[in-house]
Amino acid sequence: MDTTRPLSWDFQSQLMSNLKILYCLNMLKLSNWYFGGIMKVYGLFGINENAINDFIENHIKTFTIINALNLETVKNLKEGDLVFITSTLREDLRNGTEGILGRVINVSLVPQMINGFEEKEIIAGRVQLEMLGFAKCVKYESIHVEITFRMY
């Protein structure tokens, strides 16, 4: 398995198929179903709690990312990638940290003009995500997080 990408496209296709089945089961009130095993996904940390609550409420959200560490993650994202999002700061991440699992719908880097700083322009990442469910961190390394996952 390629270690530079968290999940292969074939595995993601199968995962999405399984998630649709789990979603149907969840709609039938079988809400304690878990996706088996542990997944390795990208992570975005220190996200504003209001933004996370909006994401949970609407199930789709475009996040604007300017934090340098999170921007490094955004640069690696592609459509269909899975992302663990949490309000917990990267350095405070521990086993059991809770967050949201989302799937990338769209990703882009956008230059923005700023005033009052030595530089005139910053690069922001914009990531549109679809909520898949809730997740807990099992292990963290660099820009990847290993998680367990539960459908909402």
UniProtKB/Swiss-Prot annotation:
Protein name: Uncharacterized protein MJ0105
Domain of life, source organism: Archaea
Species per Swiss-Prot/TrEMBL record: Methanocaldococcus jannaschii (strain ATCC 43067 / DSM 2661 / JAL-1 / JCM 10045 / NBRC 100440) (Methanococcus jannaschii)
Pfam families linked to this entry: DUF473 (PF04322)
Record-linked InterPro entries: DUF473
